[in-house]
Amino acid sequence: CIRDRNLQNPAVKNYLFDVVRGWVRDYDIDGLRLDVAYCLDLGFLAELRGLADSIKPEFALVGETLHGDYNRWMNDHACHSVTNYECYKGLYSSFNTGNMHEISYSLNRQFGSEQWCLYTGKHLLSFVDNHDVTRIATILTDKGCLHPIYGLLFGMPGVPSVYYGSEWGMEGDKRNGDPTLRPAVEKPEENDLTAWIAALAHAHTGSKALCRGSYRNVLVQPKQLIFERYADGERVLVAINADANPFDAHFDAGCGRAVDLITGDDHDFGGGSTLEPY
């Protein structure tokens, strides 16, 4: 683990930097995930960032962070991005408690347009599970919420990350140990959740607004959330219904018609919009 090394020692730093150069030269890697980045010396991070910027223009440093002000580890002299554990908790908790106000508050606090918002314009690594936490299919009390929670993951600001196996609903409880979360997989088990996530990824990749757009809450209810993403003249409304019943949403869409990014169908906002049950 890098944090256990003497990062003030020039010989240690040069060795680590030579390793990075070698990986780029031999394997053409595109970036590094830095374990426990919140424990690393900030001076070392600054030097590593300088190396990254010099050896490959789009080389990305992604740091593991848990709490605190992520700007400490995510800036022009440190990581390009960090793990968004604040919204990770808000994602599953909002669905389990039927309280979309929790995640909408976190998203606006992080990415909104007000001057006090923390990470507007930055791109944190978003996730609903990973190798260190209980799988989302296990932690959700209502498995029907798997589809809408991934819809929210790909609709919110950030870089969406899908943990292997979770794209088909693999379960695993952290309380049973790390091997439960990191099993060997012989072959994919594709299903409707896999297809749904693939469709979300396709829509996200093709949308400037979803990739780097602003964030604005439009409608927040206990089990429903609608927000706007905007970039370069493109507006996307992300609508989440975490209920087994349809919901008639009445709000100012700012237009009369739109195109569904998932289905390609036209959508008429006249008379309100019905959000289908999950």
Name what the model sees in each region.
Residues Q8-Y15:
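Alpha-helical scaffold elements lining the catalytic groove of polysaccharide deacetylases
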Residues Y15-L42, S126, N130:
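Active-site groove signature of glycoside hydrolases
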Residues L16, W23, L34, L61, ...:
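Conserved, mostly hydrophobic/aromatic
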Residues L118-T141:
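Active-site clefts of carbohydrate-active enzymes
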Residues K143-H147, P157, V162, S166-Y278:
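Carbohydrate-interacting/catalytic domains
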